Amino acid sequence: MRLEKTMTDMGRIGETPRGGLTRVALTDEDKRGRDQMVAWMREAGLAVTVDQMGNIFGERAGAETLPPVMMGSHIDSVPTGGKYDGQLGVMCGLEILRTLNDARTRTRIPSRSRSSRTRKARDSSPR
């Protein structure tokens, strides 16, 4: 249920009257979505970083210092994109990390949820 609520809440940012969304990279809606993603990652206790391209990473430590397992996608959309355009991969990654935390599961390998913007920023930004 939590994943469904997270998907619904993110889907409201940039929602269109016909049920889709427009959350084009580098717009106010994109910023609102990215700010919400950072807030959820911090609420989940993840160490949040943003790289020079604007990719957001939420990392959960592992028992050993190893390269992290990474999962994610993008939360921006093309104009009039589908409600789940890209965000499912990001939200599933976040939900997996939340669930591991809820169960107090200590993993050997660090885990990282990623919200990417590099490809979509090129494809969907206003010209």
Which stretches of residues belong to each language-model region?
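Acidic/histidine-rich catalytic neighborhood of metal-dependent amide-processing enzymes
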Residues: 78, 88-127
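Acidic/His- and Gly-rich active-site-bordering loop/insert found
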Residues: 1-82
